[in-house]
């Protein structure tokens, strides 16, 4: 039987091959997580942040808020240090995740660039 190290090495190789065969342009956020080496827990934390901020965005819109700069600041402050804020926002948007929230963030960033 193969040693555990050889089995892990083989699985890593298979995953690298699978990543090359999948159209990663369709899944830029997942590709970003893989590229930056985030763990499952770290990836789930990003999703949890987006869930919470999406709920807060809906609440603030219902209350009549029109500026959401503080939500972007919260996102940037809570985002894993392995990830770039701009790159993550565009990857989430392009993959179709948290579209409304990411559109708001992109609009804010356009005003500062």
Curated annotation (Swiss-Prot):
Pfam families: DUF1878
Protein origin, superkingdom: Bacteria
Record's protein name: Uncharacterized protein YhaI
Species of provenance: Bacillus subtilis (strain 168)
